């Protein structure tokens, strides 16, 4: 009896379900019953933890009361009660664990269905984003880039035109600077000539003043000579008159000789006086003519110098005005060039900022797309992990169902104490088992549960009754 009970205990505790999940399997209560007709029966929960799917494992009929009407036979109720309690505890634990596993499996199924729905929604959003948003964003970016390139080309052409104008203005400015330098040099030459002319004018003025002083001195000298000549003439006249008087006086004595002598002397003095007067007049006239010519030349030179000075002054004024105008034009052109360069720099900075902003938006879109792809990949990985876990649970459940579907042999035999040497052998008994097969499938994100029942008959092992 103890041998059979230990074999039953070892057969119950060494199931594949306990080896897979750790704790002992759970069984439903009410497994054993012992009737008044000495019949022992057992049942076990099969399938997915449903208490309705039970099968009778077997029944042992004790010898009839008429056949075993011996006063000394009795049953070992204590061993049967211990086996019954152990089987009940094991079955209740197995039922509880199967219920927990079913709940966990249902949670996993719900989670998988939720994740599949999210995956389908994200896949739809991703396909929509791939089909619309990137193309539209790419189209908008390409359009913006084309517009920016066109504006950059226009700005480049405008910049080239401005550079050509700047080069032309620089050439004109160089020519104007060269002309300004030439005019400045001419002005300096004119000023130098003006200084020289002023010096010449001053020299001519000094010469004129000197000549005027000389003329005055000569006029004074001429007046003095005239006076001296008049005095000499008067003296000569006086002397002539005195000589005439003397001649008249002498004529009386020496009239013929004195008259001739006086006539000769008078003729000589008259000739000398006429000659001196003529020479003085000629010298005066020549000096006057020379001084007049010199004065005229000096006046002409002074007039020419003044005219040239006025002309140089007018040229200097016109060149100064022209230089001022050119300077104003140059400053205006330089200011316009700086304004154009600043405007071009601002526009180029704005376009570069716009291009950078579009590139940043494109980069953000790419990063968002990459993030969606990573999330999608993570969801795919989670789905694959859940599929693998579901497949593992499915394999475990299929293995457990296949293990449960194997015919269950009898796990206990009753020992009767008797003094009769021969005991009627027990009749062969058959067990009937109802197997409940539950199949859980996931189709298009929905859980499909199918159940089927199968009735099996299996022959129980024959157990011998040992007597003491």
From Swiss-Prot:
Tissue/organ expression: Expressed in hypoglossal motor neurons (at protein level). Expressed in the small and large sensory neurons of the dorsal root ganglion (at protein level). Expressed in cutaneous and muscular sensory neurons.
Task: Give any Pfam family that matches.
Answer: Filament_head
Query: What disulfide bonds does the UniProt entry report for this chain?
Result: none
The record's annotation in SUPFAM superfamilies points to: Intermediate filament protein, coiled coil region
Q: What's an example GO cellular component term for this entry?
A: C-fiber
Annotated segments matching region Coil 1B: 141-236
Instruction: Outline what the protein does.
Output: Class-III neuronal intermediate filament protein. My form an independent structural network without the involvement of other neurofilaments or may cooperate with the neuronal intermediate filament proteins NEFL, NEFH, NEFM and INA to form a filamentous network. Assembly of the neuronal intermediate filaments may be regulated by RAB7A. Plays a role in the development of unmyelinated sensory neurons. May be involved in axon elongation and axon regeneration after injury. Inhibits neurite extension in type II spiral ganglion neurons in the cochlea.
Q: Which PANTHER family match?
A: GLIAL FIBRILLARY ACIDIC PROTEIN (PTHR45652), PERIPHERIN (PTHR45652:SF14)
Quaternary structure per UniProt?
A: Forms homodimers (in vitro). Homopolymerizes into a filamentous network (in vitro). Forms heterodimers with NEFL, NEFM or NEFH (in vitro). Interacts with DST (via C-terminus). Interacts with RAB7A; the interaction is direct. Interacts with PRKCE (via phorbol-ester/DAG-type 2 domain).
What is this protein's name? Peripherin
* Gene symbol of the encoding locus: Prph
